[in-house]
């Protein structure tokens, strides 16, 4: 709320939002049309599962609106005085998007992009990316409703210290960590969060909520990648990816400003390396330091994973 309070903020947001949505939507629709004929969406169960995600998002949004003191409708509405400017900017951006799409097709940029490794990853993991994005939005709504600057106590639920971590991660002038079990958060979590805060202006407290929600969506994507590799069945992997994202623990700790979701993300990344049979110390050691730096005790789970994978130390 109150993040966009200048004319240029409204113009930039409207144009960026519309351009991103139109360009991304165009290529997603093309991909979906192909998938319906011969791909992931060719299975009716997959279509049903894909459609449940927007329904879940709408349901969580409506539930949050039932608590106006926690999630006022003003959080997501464009101020009335800026509505005309927002609409005009969106129309201009939409027209610009058409021109950009024509140039992309004319110069064959899309065909060149199809040959890149990034496109290959997106193509193979689009269901997981889609699920991760929807859960990012769900957790963002919950994070905005749950977290508050009015918190002045620790251990609000399951030892989650939302108030101090909101400040540790996002307060512009810095904040004392006072937690020896999280040795590297000031050079991992905080820089990432403060980068997001650069775009939030005076509303720095929004950046921890966004970063937590982004990590939540990322863990959903990593769950999809892990399961797809393990079972070689897209439908099975997608079902359990949705179950993973919709669990109460993931929805809660993917929304509260704490270290839990960052710890989960680093652990899952390490497990993906193990699953890929990664043996290079140049990769494993930095990944292990990241796990250790978020929460010291998490390194034990990484070591257990390496042990059972028979890395080859003996």
Model regions and ranges:
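Helix-to-loop transition at the C-terminal end of transmembrane segments
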Residues: 62-71, 137-160
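Short hydrophobic/aromatic helix or loop-helix immediately within or flanking a transmembrane segment
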Residues: 175-202, 206, 210, 214
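Specific aromatic-rich, kink-prone transmembrane helix
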Residues: 262-280
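Membrane-interface alpha helices of multi-pass inner-membrane proteins
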Residues: 281-310
């Amino acid at each position: 709320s109150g993040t966009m309070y200048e004319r240029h903020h409204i113009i930039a947001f409207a144009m960026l939002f519309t351009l991103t949505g139109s360009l991304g939507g165009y290529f997603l629709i093309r991909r979906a049309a192909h998938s319906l004929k011969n791909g992931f969406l060719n299975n009716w169960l997959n279509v049903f599962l894909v459609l449940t995600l927007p329904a879940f998002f709408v349901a969580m949004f409506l539930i949050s609106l039932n608590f106006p003191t926690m999630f006022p409708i003003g959080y997501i509405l464009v101020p009335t005085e800026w509505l005309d400017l927002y609409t005009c900017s969106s129309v201009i951006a939409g027209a610009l998007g058409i021109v950009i799409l024509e140039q992309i097709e004319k110069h064959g940029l899309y065909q060149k992009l199809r040959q890149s490794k990034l496109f290959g990853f997106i193509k193979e993991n689009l269901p997981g990316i889609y699920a991760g994005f929807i859960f990012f939005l769900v957790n963002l709504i919950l994070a905005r409703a749950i977290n508050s600057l009015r918190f002045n106590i620790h251990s609000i639920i399951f030892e989650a210290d939302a108030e101090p971590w909101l400040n540790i991660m996002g307060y512009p002038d810095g904040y004392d960590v006072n937690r020896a079990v999280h040795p590297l958060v000031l050079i991992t979590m905080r820089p990432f969060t403060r980068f997001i805060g650069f775009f939030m202006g005076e509303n720095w407290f929004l950046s921890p909520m966004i970063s937590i929600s982004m990590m939540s969506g990322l863990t959903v994507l990593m769950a999809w990648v892990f399961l797809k590799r393990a079972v070689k069945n897209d439908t099975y992997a997608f079902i359990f990816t949705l179950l993973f994202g919709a669990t109460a623990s993931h929805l809660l700790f993917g929304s509260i400003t704490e270290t839990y979701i960052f710890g989960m993300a680093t652990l899952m990344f390490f497990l993906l390396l193990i699953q890929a049979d990664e043996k290079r110390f140049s990769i494993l050691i930095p990944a292990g330091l990241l796990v250790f730096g978020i929460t010291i005790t998490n390194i034990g789970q990484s070591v257990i994973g390496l042990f059972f994978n028979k890395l080859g130390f003996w």
